[in-house]
Amino acid sequence: MYSFPKNFRFGWSQAGFQSEMGTPGSEDPNTDWYKWVHDPENISAGLVSGDLPENGPGYWGNYKTFHDNAQKMGLKIARLNVEWSRIFPNQLPKPQNFDDSKQDVTEVEINQNELRRLDEHANKDALNHYREIFKDLKSRGIYFILNMYHWPLPLWLHDPIRVRRGDLSGPTGWLSTRTVYEFARFSAYIAWKFDDLVDEYSTMNEPNVVGGLGYVGVKSGFPPGYLSFELSRKAMYNIIQAHARAYDGIKSVSKKPIGIIYANSSFQPLTEKDVEAVEMAEYDNRWAFFDAIIRGEIMRGSEKVVRDDLRGRLDWIGVNYYTRTVVKKTEKGYTSLGGYGHGCERNSVSLAGLPTSDFGWEFFPEGLYDVLTKYWNRYHLYMYVTENGIADDADYQRPYYLVSHVYQVHRAINSGADVRGYLHWSLADNYEWASGFSMRFGLLKVDYGTKRLYWRPSALVYREIATNGGITDEIEHLNTVPPIRPLRH
């Protein structure tokens, strides 16, 4: 048996926009994402699926059923978020000392008077309902990580359709320092309201996806779908500042640890000659971001500067991992290659002969070990695996995927990395952003018509892991690449 440390926790992660809607009264129409997926032009262009989040799994109304299933599975940790737009659906008065002419936001004033002013504008019904959800979670002995931001912005801060059409007069989301100020205030306010129920905080989930797919990978179907490398860099600059100011804001009302959750790929060289390409890819896609919020090092234009107001703004790292990226060195640097990682055909095999998921993502568990150990060796901050899972409606690969990736976490811990939990993505099927309901990541299968939850076989495998604190001898045989099925005709 592969046993984990006694204090290690197995659990799950989920997001509000993807899971909450689906029961009467659960709709949240006041976000950029809601407007984006309902936009007729986006739907007709195939940028989004046409599936609508208000038909989702219904966690807002049925959270106790979700928690019942998690408890039966033996899960002991959960990462959830508060939807910003539910708490502040309407535009707030501008923050004190706000100056939109300044590129650098080095401080956002947070005090008791400011928090009380925010409280006057907050949606009390939403606050009370979130408290009911979190209290129910805690009553079951589940350790709780509260994440502040999992992609949707309030419409009063970001109108993605206007930006997509080239209107940058506002509201422009992460292109504006106003969003930096507001996120700091929101994060401090949420910590002020819920600190008695929270064990640890995360400021954001996968900020690199927001800054990348919204402005560079515009065919991904992510808002605002405005192609501009310059604006992508501007958005990431503001996101880094927003994390640091939110960290300060939360610390002003709480002593709990604060992390950030990041989308990771394991960069692998095509040949031995491409090791330098891996180093460049890791810096561009990972270390540049974390060097900013840990060491204070950030690029301003073409110049690297050190900002003390960014330094040391992180207590732990949330590692999201699904697959790898194979890179090759070029004259100008490096390039990522199709046929591996995220760039494969769906339900097929990669160029390496490895099976791929319903999403076309390659089965590559050893990449999780690579990511965890490299984070540990560079920063020595403790970690959680905050997302790991597979789109697999048939649940054929998921049992293998689950055991193989949990094993790689065990390897990383044995190599000295401080990893304190594994949170699977996800407990139940949900709304997979631009792909709608077609991509099913759940241990529990959702019947979207009845909102009933059904246990997939992989849920039984995860229960075996969670209740025994590791990979037992009975399921160790799943620590391998799943046998590849014949191609369907």
Swiss-Prot record:
Instruction: Name the catalysed reactions.
Output: Hydrolysis of terminal non-reducing beta-D-galactose residues in beta-D-galactosides
Modified-residue entries (N6-methyllysine), positions: 135, 273, 332
Q: Which InterPro entries match?
A: Beta-galactosidase, Glyco_hydro_1, Glyco_hydro_1_AS, Glyco_hydro_1_N_CS, Glycoside_hydrolase_SF
EC identifiers of the protein: 3.2.1.23
One GO BP annotation here? carbohydrate metabolic process
Q: Catalytic center at which residues?
A: 206, 387
Description of how the protein assembles with itself and partners: Homotetramer.
Q: What is this protein called?
A: Beta-galactosidase
Its gene is: bglY
